[in-house]
Amino acid sequence: SHDIRIPLVSATGSTRMGKAVGAAVGRRLGRSLLELGGNNAIIISAEADLDMALIGAAFGAVGTAGQRCTSTRRLIIQEKVYNKFKEKLVNAYKQLKIGDPLNIKNHVGPLIDKDAVKMYLEAIEKCKAEGGKFIVEGGVLKGKGFESGCYVQPCIAEAKNSYGIVQHDTFAPILYLMKYKTID
């Protein structure tokens, strides 16, 4: 971002990262294109193919342990299919295999470090404090294969889009479910 030979810096990530990139590029009067703090969503309509939506939602939320800037963090589900989809999603989460990411039988690997684990746990507590209801509980996994302390349980919370934590990027496998009546 400091190199004047680079005419445009494009980055996707947290608001914090964007401020750092923006400041560095701004010092050289360069241009930047930033996509920040979006907490990607999937909107599931009453007409959606729920099995297809389930595959996309589950992979988007837990792939790379939710540590991509493009990870799915919110599911906005039409109320007529909300309970049916929620049941399918909870069942899918019960079948997730967590462990060494080099083992192709595993779906979810570790968070990058203990700081990421701390932010994951803080996000869970913030969601609960704002009124979120966890339908799949999170937590740090213990036991054989999890000695690093960086393996966590992907979790699902019923939440409201107005919650502060829902508007804040958490690079971890936390998925927020929200119900809608009409798209408007």
Language model features with spans:
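A structured beta-alpha segment of the ubiquitous adenosine-cofactor-binding alpha/beta core
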Residues: 1-10
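ALDH superfamily catalytic-core signature
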Residues: 8, 14-161, 179-184
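Histidine (H) residue identity feature
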Residues: 2, 103-107, 168
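A structural signal for short secondary-structure junctions
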Residues: 69, 169-170
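Cytochrome P450 core scaffold surrounding the K-helix E-X-X-R motif
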Residues: 163-167
